[in-house]
Design a protein with these regions (language model features):
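Intrinsic-disorder/low-complexity, polar/charged segments enriched in Ser/Thr/Lys/Arg/Asp/Glu/Gln
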Residues: 3-5, 25, 47
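Beta-rich strand-turn-strand
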Residues: 53-89
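Acidic, gly/ser/pro-rich intrinsically disordered tails
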Residues: 1-2, 14-22, 37-43, 58, ...
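Short edge beta-strand segments in beta-sheet-rich domains
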Residues: 25, 45, 87-96
Length: 120
């Protein structure tokens, strides 16, 4: 079984490309916080490359934007290609089947944090 569910923030707006027969692809990176802090007491994140096709890509194009907290369900895909130097580059991506809204945007989170601090 190849199934993955991730929750994180979009690092930038999805990049939309169009293929044959008006078939669109949405590509974006999801910053997923690790469940622990590093030695300096800071949270680190993994940056996961994601791609959505067809209806899932249309959803991403219409609704997703930088800073949004979302969850995704999909499958991990690995691949490889040869770069300009002739080296083999290995890739790991998530092929997104579904998107889920989970909360606010980064801007809204900052506003809420400012409100909490001003109440203290």
């Amino acid at each position: 079984m190849n199934s993955v569910i991730l929750m994180g923030r979009l690092t930038k707006d999805p990049e939309i490309t169009e293929g044959k027969d008006d078939f669109i692809v949405a590509r974006y990176t999801l910053a997923v916080d690790r469940p622990f802090k590093n030695r300096d007491g800071e949270r680190e994140a993994d940056f996961i490359r994601c791609q959505a096709f067809g209806k899932a890509a249309e959803f991403a194009e219409t609704y997703l934007e930088k800073g949004m907290m979302i969850a995704i369900k999909g499958q991990i895909r690995t691949g490889s290609y040869e770069n300009k130097s002739g080296d083999t580059v290995y890739t790991t991506d998530v092929n997104v089947e579904q998107h889920f809204f989970t909360g606010s945007s980064a801007k809204e989170d900052k506003k809420e944090e400012t409100k909490r601090r001003s109440r203290r």
